[in-house]
């Protein structure tokens, strides 16, 4: 199964070229939960980034993501390290063994405090896509 990209950022201003920040600020930032939001892309979003006119966005305060975004001057593009319908993986050795030779880079650092995957919500409908 092909997984869609997730945009991770510590700074909402980095999203200006990808999504409508006003809607995102008004809805997602008020929520405050550990949530990934599916939002409509704007006309400036690179076409290779999505196939369905929407993209997943997660604002995070994780120090490793914050440092990466700061050094790159923008958000980072990620995907899930978990296989569909499989147990949540949070051990780097297990990830390296399962995805041997299939991942270009693994950034080593402390994991966040969350014990499960984030909730995924559609920002327009508030529909929960994953709980």
Task: Name these PLM-found stretches.
Residues 1-131:
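Active-site-adjacent structural elements in enzyme catalytic cores
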